């Protein structure tokens, strides 16, 4: 008879053999891009706090003041008595910024997608998702009971083919995609997706976790990257990346948001976010709206890095360097850490097999000299050495 501990050890040993075991490493983040690990001062290039707002004095002050006024927790589900006044203020500001009628805030982005998708589609309906969509979009899709089809990454022709083949047999159809893809940093063709969705009577939902605050007109996100706002009826995103706090949201029409508040199990059965988290997001959003030029800095920093390496200009603060092998990727990450740079290696199943990578993320406060030195290290110690092997 196999014991629980024996089962766990066997699985861990198998993961270790493939260089796929995960470990938590205590990381002390400070102002700017500085982090401390095991007493060592490192420059972090693997943080999603793109605008460094988690350390902004106004944002921290708002969190402290909200705690003093409302306490450390909301005390209940939002639908019971946990809907403190700050929720409404944040939701109104998000809806106004994203140019929608209403907004609902969740405990996290993952919880948002796990609640939204099953609230909109179910058995007899169809979901078509980009193959590189975030895990929570795919998990929410499976939970819904709807039929799920996958289209090749950013391949509009393949999506149209799947719509032609399967849309007629489904009552409702939901198209899912990241706005900015978290592991590759590229953007979805949102305007083309919106046009195709309208043509086939489908609903388009974008997960803009890595777009809000850093791409699009005034940092409004991927739906605003074109000359005019794309017709995306379901704009989902997070408050934990460029906003610097915690939580998720959906901006949509008033009837849709009302339905989500009524049906989303991850909202109904979860305690509301603490007042401090909501207040911090309000303050961060105020900063973002008042400083559009500052919001451009993460992408500008990323471009200075790629140009030093002769790579294509990125559209987001995310720059992947695909190395393929998990062990090679871990070794490259360790090499950079020994030189004072924190760049985490990303391995399967987070990314597809054979695409393990270093994922560099850039923030508004990264020092240009650090970026230049990092680029030199990557070029001479990783790229050129691999080319010579």
Swiss-Prot record:
GO terms for molecular function: 8-amino-7-oxononanoate synthase activity; pyridoxal phosphate binding. CDD domains: KBL_like (cd06454). Keywords: Biotin biosynthesis, Pyridoxal phosphate, Transferase. Substrate binds at residues 22, 134, 350. Pyridoxal 5'-phosphate binds at residues 109-110, 182, 207-210, 238-241. Its EC number is 2.3.1.47. It is an enzyme of class 2 (transferase). The modification N6-(pyridoxal phosphate)lysine is found at residue 241. GO terms for biological process: biotin biosynthetic process. Its cofactor is pyridoxal 5'-phosphate. Belongs to the class-II pyridoxal-phosphate-dependent aminotransferase family. BioF subfamily. Catalyzes the decarboxylative condensation of pimeloyl-[acyl-carrier protein] and L-alanine to produce 8-amino-7-oxononanoate (AON), [acyl-carrier protein], and carbon dioxide. Homodimer. This is Putative 8-amino-7-oxononanoate synthase. It comes from Parvibaculum lavamentivorans (strain DS-1 / DSM 13023 / NCIMB 13966).
């Amino acid at each position: 008879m196999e014991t629980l501990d024996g089962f766990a050890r066997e699985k861990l040993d198998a993961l270790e053999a493939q260089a796929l075991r995960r470990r938590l490493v205590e990381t002390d983040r400070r102002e700017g891009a500085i982090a401390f690990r095991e007493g060592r001062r490192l420059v972090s290039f693997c943080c999603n706090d793109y605008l460094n707002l988690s350390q902004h004095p106004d944002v921290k002050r708002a969190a402290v003041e909200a705690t003093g006024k409302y306490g450390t927790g909301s005390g209940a589900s939002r639908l019971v008595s946990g809907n403190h006044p700050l929720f409404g203020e944040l939701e109104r500001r998000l809806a106004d910024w994203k140019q929608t009628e209403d907004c609902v805030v969740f405990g996290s982005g993952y919880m948002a997608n796990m609640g939204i998708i099953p609230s909109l589609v179910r058995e007899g309906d169809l979901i078509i998702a980009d193959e590189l969509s975030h895990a929570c979009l795919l998990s929410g899709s499976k939970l819904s009971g709807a039929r799920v089809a996958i289209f090749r990454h950013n391949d509009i022709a393949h999506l149209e083919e799947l719509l032609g083949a399967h849309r007629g047999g489904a009552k409702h159809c939901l198209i899912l995609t990241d706005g900015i893809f978290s592991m590759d940093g590229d953007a979805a063709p949102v305007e083309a997706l919106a046009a195709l969705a309208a043509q086939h009577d489908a609903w388009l939902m974008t997960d803009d976790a890595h777009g809000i605050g850093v791409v699009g007109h005034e940092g409004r996100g991927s739906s605003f990257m074109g000359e005019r706002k794309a017709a995306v009826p379901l704009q989902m995103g997070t408050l934990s990346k460029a906003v610097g706090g915690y939580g998720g949201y959906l901006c949509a029409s008033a009837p849709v948001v009302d339905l989500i508040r009524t049906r989303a199990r991850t909202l109904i059965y979860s305690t509301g976010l603490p007042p401090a988290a909501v207040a911090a997001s309000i303050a961060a959003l105020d900063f973002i709206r008042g400083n559009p030029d500052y919001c451009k800095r993460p992408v500008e920093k990323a471009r200075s890095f790629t140009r030093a390496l002769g790579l294509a200009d990125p559209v987001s603060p995310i720059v992947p360097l695909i190395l393929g092998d998990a062990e090679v990727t871990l070794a490259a990450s360790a090499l950079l850490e020994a030189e004072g740079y924190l760049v985490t290696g990303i391995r399967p199943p987070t990314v597809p097999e054979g695409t393990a990578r270093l994922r560099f993320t850039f923030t508004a406060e990264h020092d240009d000299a650090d970026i230049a030195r990092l680029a030199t290290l990557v070029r001479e110690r990783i790229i050129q050495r691999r080319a010579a092997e």
